[in-house]
UniProtKB/Swiss-Prot annotation:
SUPFAM superfamilies for the chain: Cytochrome P450
Biological source species: Arabidopsis thaliana
Binding site for heme: 458
InterPro entries to which the protein is assigned, alphabetical: Cyt_P450, Cyt_P450_CS, Cyt_P450_E_grp-I, Cyt_P450_sf
Name by which UniProt lists this protein: Cytochrome P450 86A8
GO function term, MF aspect, one: heme binding
Induction annotation: Induced by abscisic acid (ABA) and auxin. Down-regulated by wounding.
Coiled coil: none
Cofactor(s) of this protein: heme
């Protein structure tokens, strides 16, 4: 009996390792270990996860498959993960077969307590209805004007004074933290018309901002942990699950008060002539009757989408230009050239007010530099979907129903096959047409996926560029930034590509005298050439 049992166990082990050998040969990508699948490799490279994924994708021509659970009957379904950055596959997943690749139940369960069935956490008809409603608002000129108004006021009254105080005091400042505060204030103003004033002298603590951060952090931890584990922790009220519950109560109370007050104001606005142009008020005005809970989730979804993305992109942008002074000079000259034409030669007038929308629209090279930043350091480096039905990707990869698919936005911007041999270089010129008068090139959205693509492409893309260009131009005109000596700039491994240790910078005064003199000389030469060419007899 003991011998037969031993033989059965030995046969089972032998059969398992034969199966493991077979499955390992079928899956190209990181090594698959017994039971644990590719998790050991993931854990070993957790501090450089995005680059590790990129390395694997380069070695596998843009697509690989692995399993995170090397157990028969699971490895080719629930445990299988397809990872890709091939533009053909991205177009297939995000556009052509959009309905077959929803966010899926795992993603929705993780963020449900925070985002509910909001636009960024829903699929199907629920998502489509909210998307259509929001799309109508994001295409209006008044929303762009409202965004410009919030951004310019915050830049002038709070952001720039903080930078100036840091310069005068010769004290380093964490630019990433400051940008997070600024964009949080801006998106709150645009979303529900109230300024939490987190970006203010002294950098005050705001209870809503703190509660929102804690709720987001707790939700992200769920994404990392196995579903059964975080649900068990929630049931026992352990760790960040307790913090999530408390934070959500604070967030809900804060937003509930705003919604109640706003509805009362809107009922009397015809009498006092007061007008609200924030997103919350626009949704309240809709013919459809939204519950207060739905309005809260709408607001939270837009805040989550609009805060981190722009601030993270700007942090990497400012770091990159400190490493590339020639590009910084080119951006600055473009800004000054526009201001000479719109405000004249007086340098004092250039810094009197933040740039207008019309002036910002002319900053083609700045937009190119921001786009190049997002190509190399996308705010959301990886995203995932769940396959509803069996499918075959354009490159021939079979994707079984029930399996996960990760599309690497970070890797998509770093492939030689897509961007050329210089794909790892910071080169804004790749976004400028050399044969069409310096026009900005809108690259294929399935090559440049920083704003997503297909039906879920970012609605706030233009507003994001508006905000980033406003902030970047305001800083560059007034200050020169240098990274504090010895400060480490590393990626933080999270759903958003934060800098792990922030971005500590020293703030110096910007001297525009030389640029102004050069521009005046160029202007004078153009005038003289024009006069000379126009003389005839």
């Amino acid at each position: 009996m003991e011998i037969s049992t031993a033989l059965m166990i030995l046969s089972a082990i032998t059969a398992y390792f034969l199966w493991l050998t077979f499955i390992s040969r079928c899956l190209k990508g990181p090594r698959v270990w017994p039971i644990l699948g590719s998790l050991p490799g993931l854990i070993e490279n957790c501090e450089r996860m995005h680059d590790w994924i990129s390395d694997n994708l380069r070695a596998c021509s843009g697509t690989y498959q692995t399993c995170i659970c090397a157990i028969p009957f699971l490895a080719k379904k629930q445990g299988l993960v397809t990872v890709t950055c091939d533009p053909r596959n991205l177009e297939h997943i995000l556009k052509n077969r959009f309905d077959n690749y929803p966010k899926g139940p795992t993603w929705q369960a993780v963020f449900h307590d925070l985002l509910g069935q909001g636009i960024f956490n829903s699929d199907g008809d629920t998502w489509l209805f909210q998307r259509k409603t929001a799309a109508l608002e994001f295409t209006t000129r008044t929303l762009r004007q409202a965004m410009a108004r919030w951004v310019n006021r915050a830049i002038k009254l709070r952001f720039l004074p903080i930078l100036e105080n840091a310069r005068l005091g010769s004290e380093p400042i964490d630019l990433q933290d400051l940008l997070l505060r600024l964009t949080f204030d801006n998106i709150c103003g645009l979303t529900f018309g109230k300024d939490p004033r987190t970006c203010a002298p002294g950098l005050p603590v705001n209870t809503f901002a703190v509660a929102f951060d804690r709720a987001t952090e707790a939700s992200l931890q769920r994404f990392i942990l196995p579903e059964i584990l975080w649900k068990f922790k929630r049931w026992l009220r352990l760790g960040l699950e307790v913090s999530l519950t408390r934070s959500l109560v604070q967030v809900d109370n804060y937003l509930s008060e705003i919604i109640t007050t706003r509805k009362e104001e809107m009922m009397t606005q015809h009498n006092n002539g007061k007008h609200h142009d924030d997103l919350l008020s626009r949704f309240i005005k809709k013919k459809e009757s939204y519950s207060d809970e739905t309005l809260q989730r709408v607001a939270l979804n837009f805040i989550l989408a609009g805060r981190d993305t722009s601030s993270v992109a700007l942090s990497w942008f400012f770091w990159l230009i400190t490493q590339h002074p020639a590009i910084e000079d080119k951006i600055l000259r473009e800004i000054c050239t526009v201001l000479v034409e719109t405000r004249g030669d007086d340098v004092a007038l250039w810094t009197d007010e933040p740039l207008s929308c019309e002036e910002l629209d002319r900053l083609v090279f700045l937009k190119a530099a921001l786009s190049e930043t997002l190509r190399l350091y996308p705010s959301v480096p990886e995203d995932s979907k769940r396959a509803v039905k069996d499918d075959v990707l354009p490159d021939g990869t079979f994707v079984p129903a029930g399996s996960s698919i990760t599309y690497s936005i970070y890797s998509a911007g770093r492939m030689k096959s897509t961007w050329g041999e210089d794909c790892l270089e910071f080169k804004p010129e790749r976004w400028i047409s050399q044969s069409d008068g310096g026009r900005f090139i809108n690259h294929d959205p399935f090559k440049f996926v920083a704003f997503n693509a297909g039906p879920r492409i970012c609605l706030g893309k233009d507003l994001a560029y508006l905000q980033m260009k406003s902030i970047a131009s305001a800083v560059l005109l007034r200050h020169r930034l240098t990274v504090v000596t010895g400060h480490k700039v590393e990626q933080k491994m999270s759903l958003t590509l934060f800098m792990k240790y922030g971005l500590l910078v020293n703030v110096h005064e910007r001297d525009l005298t030389a640029i102004a003199a050069d521009l005046r000389e160029c202007k004078s030469n153009v005038v003289n050439d024009g006069v000379g060419n126009g003389v005839s007899s």
